[in-house]
Amino acid sequence: MDTMDTMGRHVIAELWDCDFDKLNDMPFIEQLFVDAALRAGAEVREVAFHKFAPQGVSGVVIISESHLTIHSFPEHGYASIDVYTCGDRIDPNVAAEYIAEGLNAKTRESIELPRGTGSFEIKQRETKAL
């Protein structure tokens, strides 16, 4: 893991070719996100998820260190996720990878942005076949 002198790290990930049923299962996604936060070492504070008709789930897990979010589009096999952590104690990539694996994403494209350092440049771009 690269260390950064930053107030936070923000992973933005595009997950493609995910399992339709998992993307449309709100209780599953909620538990997956709570587990991802805990696996990364975060402290969960609040959880809010919403199931859309006919399909799709959006939600947020508020952690002491910031948040994890998802917007799922089962009809496209796609989910957009954000994992933002403050400080350098927690690696947001741990949670993002756990989520991608849990949704059976075939492809994950992500970037990591340092936050709170003024002007920023993209520190990492990764496309990964899972």
Curated annotation (Swiss-Prot):
Coiled coil: none
Keywords: Autocatalytic cleavage, Decarboxylase, Lyase, Polyamine biosynthesis, Pyruvate, S-adenosyl-L-methionine, Schiff base, Spermidine biosynthesis, Zymogen
GO cellular component, one term: cytosol
Single annotated GO MF: adenosylmethionine decarboxylase activity
Keyword S-adenosyl-L-methionine assigned: yes
Residue numbers marked as site, Cleavage (non-hydrolytic): E65, S66
EC category: lyase
Subunit structure: Heterotetramer of two alpha and two beta chains arranged as a dimer of alpha/beta heterodimers.
Name of the protein: S-adenosylmethionine decarboxylase proenzyme
Species whose genome carries this gene: Bacillus cytotoxicus (strain DSM 22905 / CIP 110041 / 391-98 / NVH 391-98)
